[in-house]
Amino acid sequence: MSLSRRSVLTAGAVATGAVALGTATGAATAAATAPRFSLHYAPHEGSFASRGGRIEQIAFAADQGFTAWEDNEAGTRPVAEQVAMAKALQQRNMTMGVFVASMPKWSQFRPLLGGNDDAEREGFLADIRASVAVAKRLDARCMTVVTGFMDRKLPVEIQTGRIIDVMRRAAEIVEPHKLVMVMEPLNTRTNHPGVYMQSIAQGYAVAKGVNSPAVKVLADLYHEQIQSGNLIPTLEMCWDEIGYIQFGDNPGRNEPGTGEIHYQNIVRRLRARNYAGVIGMEHGNQVDGRAGEDRLIAAYRAIDRA
């Protein structure tokens, strides 16, 4: 997840058509404290932009029944802002989701963690070391890792071996602190051409190779639907290496119900698996403004009833 990608998400998307959610759009604002959701769906800054700044949005999310929060850019924020966010979440009994531990240089197609330059791997490990303090300030357990880009001059197998090796070294850094790095596979068809890790199954293979509780896979279902599809069987096959989940519908990368993914069935399967982790709402709102925020809440109420 890049800063530019998050900026796009938090800005909101232009409406591409009305989707009936079966819930009145004004219902979300009617109650000051709504019942808590049954799963830990995590909005992000911008999900409720009309309600104020980051702290105000956290308070509003809690009042609407959300029990978690996600902030990809938390590691880049001043320490005082990190501390304030952690305090706000603690006061609302909310769980902190992921932040990005090592941000790729998207426009440069770097780093090449499986390439020939050890300096790129050392830079990545330095980011991981710095992220330990961030995680402690935020009271976060999971941090997102993007395993970089492909080196088209090298065999994929060589790159896989090197990425397994560098992730083992990273695990040695975070495991003593009981932290988990979740590797995020990204789609190459729409958003991120050239990345190394392109599917949950590929992430599963790397995680198995690392063989550490500190290295798992982030199952972003928006990316997986574009790249591979077959979502529920993939989740089942890779379940023991999945450490975190993110939602987002396709096309459009907006809230559930705006695209082709049957999120009610996904939720049923997560319940059957007794999934108790955070589910990041890493997507935009299809409709701008307060009406779009109400639709967002209604969309999650609809799938949470599944």
Walk through the language-model features, giving the residues of each.
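Active-site acidic/histidine proton-transfer and metal-coordination neighborhood
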Residues: 12-14, 33-35, 91, 111-216
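Glycine-rich, proline-tolerant flexible connector loops at the mouths of alpha/beta enzymes
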Residues: 71-90, 147-151, 191
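Glycine-rich, aromatic-flanked loop segments that form ligand/cofactor-binding clefts
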Residues: 93-101
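Short glycine-enriched loops at secondary-structure junctions
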Residues: 47-49, 100-104
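Histidine-acidic metal/acid-base catalytic patches
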Residues: 2-42, 47-62, 140, 197-219, ...
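Conserved radical SAM core fold
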Residues: 104-109, 150, 188, 248-254
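Catalytic domains of carbohydrate-active enzymes, especially glycoside hydrolases
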Residues: 57-74
